[in-house]
Amino acid sequence: MGSGEEPSQMRRALVDSLAGAISGGISRTVTSPLDVIKIRFQVQLEPTTSWGILRRDIYGPSKYTGLLQATKDILREEGLPGFWRGNVPALLMYMPYTAIQFTVLHKLKTFASGSSKTEDHLHLSPYLSYVSGALAGCAATIGSYPFDLLRTILASQGEPKIYPNMRSAFVDIIKTRGVQGLYSGLSPTLVEIIPYAGLQFGSYDTFKRSMMTWNRYKYSHLNFGSEDDSVSSFQLFLCGFAAGTFSKAACHPLDVVKKRFQIEGLKRHPRYGARIESSTYKGMYHALKEIVAKEGFGGLYKGLFPSLVKSAPAGAVTFVAYEYISDWIGSKAGVE
């Protein structure tokens, strides 16, 4: 590698990191209310639908029984700040997560394509896009995981709070689980993130290529003027929206298992239902079997609706913001 290429690659990595961090922060803050509701559903052992009210003799009373009911309950009991509970560790997690993810992704695509230009990366095979996305997701997860754990713990509690702030949750985890407790649930998280990140980035590239093909066809066959395959902001939004929906729907059961491992054995106010005791789940496969046995197959899809309502726009906002911020910073820094 020539010495002239190194500063350029360093600038490119800085652009990717900064654009990824900013886009991740915007996306996470905008969609935090839906993320809080999703997490409350995922860690609730009792049914999360109105059907649970009719079967409370079997399962016990359910705290949350639907998206609208949960929204009203959180607003009444915790006020508007309740919808941003855990947002500080979420930002501390998601900003470095997206920074690492987009930086590693660009590096992998540059290596695979032999070019650092983004437009050349679209010519990679779908298989390489999926693999690059999965590897980038793994690197980002390992680098930011303790904040993901703290986000889940703070977002899952309501009022009265068990942990008043991030520091108290951190201290209690160290005290009860040791330093390794900060990585509780990392294995199922990696099992989840490999297909999730692979599908998210792979499908985004696939949708974007399809959109460019449609644009070329539209301009050449439908008399729209000169040929142009550039993708508009709205089309980028649609690609991100579709990628977010597809990847989240496919991997949601693994996300439920991950959340259960993260709060296993931690304190929980009785108002929010049964506590998940330590060593309830002996492994990922055992957790899947236990959830199905005790909660039915629907237990694996708790929080799916708020998750999809959140993930689709979150994916769209992240990708669109990244594309534009990356282009803007790159133009200022003289990076292609």
Curated annotation (Swiss-Prot):
<feature type="transmembrane region" description="Helical; Name=1">
    <location>
        <begin position="11"/>
        <end position="27"/>
    </location>
</feature>
<feature type="transmembrane region" description="Helical; Name=3">
    <location>
        <begin position="127"/>
        <end position="150"/>
    </location>
</feature>
<dbReference type="Pfam" id="PF00153">
    <property type="entry name" value="Mito_carr"/>
</dbReference>
<dbReference type="GO" id="GO:0030974">
    <property type="term" value="P:thiamine pyrophosphate transmembrane transport"/>
</dbReference>
<keyword id="KW-0472">Membrane</keyword>
<feature type="repeat" description="Solcar 2">
    <location>
        <begin position="124"/>
        <end position="210"/>
    </location>
</feature>
<dbReference type="GO" id="GO:0005743">
    <property type="term" value="C:mitochondrial inner membrane"/>
</dbReference>
<comment type="function">
    <text>Mitochondrial transporter that mediates uptake of thiamine diphosphate (ThDP) into mitochondria.</text>
</comment>
<keyword id="KW-0496">Mitochondrion</keyword>
<comment type="similarity">
    <text>Belongs to the mitochondrial carrier (TC 2.A.29) family.</text>
</comment>
<protein>
    <recommendedName>
        <fullName>Mitochondrial thiamine diphosphate carrier 2</fullName>
    </recommendedName>
</protein>
<dbReference type="InterPro" id="IPR018108">
    <property type="entry name" value="Mitochondrial_sb/sol_carrier"/>
</dbReference>
<dbReference type="InterPro" id="IPR023395">
    <property type="entry name" value="Mt_carrier_dom_sf"/>
</dbReference>
<keyword id="KW-0812">Transmembrane</keyword>
<dbReference type="GO" id="GO:0005739">
    <property type="term" value="C:mitochondrion"/>
</dbReference>
<dbReference type="InterPro" id="IPR002067">
    <property type="entry name" value="Mit_carrier"/>
</dbReference>
<feature type="transmembrane region" description="Helical; Name=4">
    <location>
        <begin position="182"/>
        <end position="199"/>
    </location>
</feature>
<keyword id="KW-1133">Transmembrane helix</keyword>
<keyword id="KW-0999">Mitochondrion inner membrane</keyword>
<feature type="transmembrane region" description="Helical; Name=6">
    <location>
        <begin position="303"/>
        <end position="322"/>
    </location>
</feature>
<feature type="repeat" description="Solcar 3">
    <location>
        <begin position="231"/>
        <end position="328"/>
    </location>
</feature>
<feature type="transmembrane region" description="Helical; Name=2">
    <location>
        <begin position="88"/>
        <end position="105"/>
    </location>
</feature>
<dbReference type="GO" id="GO:0015234">
    <property type="term" value="F:thiamine transmembrane transporter activity"/>
</dbReference>
<keyword id="KW-0813">Transport</keyword>
<feature type="transmembrane region" description="Helical; Name=5">
    <location>
        <begin position="230"/>
        <end position="246"/>
    </location>
</feature>
<dbReference type="GO" id="GO:0090422">
    <property type="term" value="F:thiamine pyrophosphate transmembrane transporter activity"/>
</dbReference>
<keyword id="KW-0677">Repeat</keyword>
<feature type="repeat" description="Solcar 1">
    <location>
        <begin position="11"/>
        <end position="111"/>
    </location>
</feature>
